[in-house]
């Protein structure tokens, strides 16, 4: 969801995408990887196949030390997906792309762990602590930004999102999102959150990817760009900011054109 922010820049070189990780739950990141399912090769899109493979291999954690960046932006919209969990503690995200490959998600003794369940929460919190400690060890925790967004309840013309998303589903998802944001806020300062008026989190009826509770009106993306630009300028003024390394639901790893090293 955060990736769409960059499409609304007037100056496309101001915020530059270094890397992008999607369809990967933080709950999956904190667990052991499953064996790569042969069905993954059925995913025709190279981008979508790579996205699924990165989740299964936990590439994000392995890549963290190898990228130079100014900001690491995460959002929790992809936490809406269920998980596939094997008895040995191996986990992956049951994204739509993985399920479309023919992966059943209930084979080899594994089972589905539903979003919003307490088991999901336990795995998610464990994953968050692993990500948090990794960023601390690399000295880049201050580069982390959390895009604190919620599912919208209405479209810009007053419509709802049924039959795909009911009001009850939206309310429940937002309650769980709020629980996750509250947990993260225990570990990082409020200045590292991007926060928005709820009116901006209204569903666009002309969004590139269609109508959805998390495909917002243009005003949201403009507000996000303003906050990201301000955060990037602040990070560049910080002592030693040009020397830090590392990357990043869906984490976005961004650099700023003002940083000559990037």
Stretches found by the model and what they are:
Residues 38-113:
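A basic- and aromatic-enriched beta-loop-alpha substructure that forms the phosphate/nucleotide-
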Residues 1-71, 206, 228-242, 249-254:
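Basic, amphipathic N-terminal segments that precede the first structured/catalytic domain
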Residues 154-195:
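Substrate-gating cap/lid alpha-helix
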Residues 1-5, 80-85, 152-158, 201-206:
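Short catalytic/ligand-binding loop motif for oxyanion handling, primarily in non-cytosolic enzymes
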Residues 56-58, 117-133, 167-182, 218-222:
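Well-ordered, non-membrane alpha-helical segments in soluble/globular domains
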Residues 126-145, 179-194:
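A structural motif corresponding to the C-terminal end of an alpha-helix
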Residues 146-150, 189-207, 240:
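Acidic carboxylate-rich catalytic motifs and surrounding loops in phosphoryl-/glycosyl-chemistry enzymes
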Residues 43-47, 81, 98-129, 159-171, ...:
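Surface-exposed cleft-lining segments at the edges of enzyme active sites
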């Amino acid at each position: 969801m955060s990736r769409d922010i960059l499409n609304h820049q007037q100056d496309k070189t101001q915020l530059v995408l270094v890397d992008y990780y999607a369809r990967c739950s933080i709950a999956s990141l904190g667990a052991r990887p499953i064996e790569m399912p042969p069905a993954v090769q059925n995913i025709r899109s190279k981008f979508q196949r790579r996205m699924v493979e990165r989740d299964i291999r936990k590439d994000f954690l392995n890549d963290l030390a190898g990228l130079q960046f100014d900001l690491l932006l995460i959002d929790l919209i992809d936490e809406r997906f269920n998980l596939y969990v094997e008895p040995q503690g191996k986990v992956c995200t049951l994204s739509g792309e993985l399920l479309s490959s023919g992966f059943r998600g209930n084979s080899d003794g594994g089972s589905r762990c539903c979003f919003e369940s307490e088991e999901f929460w336990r795995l998610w919190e464990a994953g968050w602590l692993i990500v948090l400690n990794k960023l601390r060890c690399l000295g880049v925790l201050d580069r982390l930004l959390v895009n604190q967004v919620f599912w919208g309840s209405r479209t810009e013309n007053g419509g709802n999102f049924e039959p795909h998303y009911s009001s009850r589903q939206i309310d429940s998802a937002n309650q769980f999102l709020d629980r996750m944001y509250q947990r993260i806020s225990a570990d990082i300062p409020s200045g590292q959150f991007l926060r928005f008026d709820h009116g901006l989190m209204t569903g666009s009826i002309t969004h590139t990817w269609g109508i959805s509770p998390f495909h917002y009106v243009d005003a949201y993306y403009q507000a996000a760009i303003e906050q990201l630009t301000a955060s990037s300028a602040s990070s560049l003024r910080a002592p030693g900011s040009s020397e830090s390394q590392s990357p990043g639901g869906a984490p976005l790893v961004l650099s700023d054109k003002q940083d000559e090293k990037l």
